[in-house]
Amino acid sequence: FKNNKISYFCVDDNYVKESNFEGIPIIPYSELLNIKLRNDYKVFVALSYKNMNKVREAKYKQIKKLGFTFTSFIHKNSYISDKATIGENCFILENQTIQRNVIIKNNVFLWSGNHVGHNSIIDDNTYLSSHVVISGDCKIGKNCFFGVNSSVKDSITIKNEVLIGMGASVTKNITEGSVVIN
């Protein structure tokens, strides 16, 4: 968030236990409705992969409907090709390699140390845990989850809502709603 100042933390109303965190005010979600100058703020939805990323997706869509814009977090110690495209509300931790012509759509989380090969597309609301390898020319659907040390062979298509387990190797196209474990 190098060019952004954190103004508030916002949590669902029933989770507000304190008035601030690290000196930054915490506001209940219901107070977002009271913010008039919504273009003055950018939002980042920091929820994890629960329920195949659908909890984060739902909150992202709720806030988007309110008219807010979003920012992404990209760690300074990641390599991202200047020919890659990163969407909004993406969380990209350290030691990533994101090669040329990669498209990472909205609300995608990449934990530490992943490789996304040239010309690959990662669709909305997907989560890569650590040390995942997606080879070149792959197409990854919406709401997928990749376990630690999983890998995908070149030119593979993985449809929506697929769970790739820890250490799994994907060597063929995967249909929607599948689970892949080795």
Q: What is each of the regions a protein language model found here?
A:
Residues 3-20:
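NAD(P)-binding Rossmann-fold cofactor-contacting core
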Residues 1-3, 36:
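Short, conserved loop/helix-junction motifs that constitute active-site signature segments
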Residues 13-14, 49, 168:
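Glycine-rich beta-alpha junction loops
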Residues 17-75, 79:
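Phosphate-bearing ligand-interacting subdomains
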Residues 3, 65-66, 176:
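Short, well-ordered coil loops that connect the C-terminus of an alpha-helix to the N-terminus
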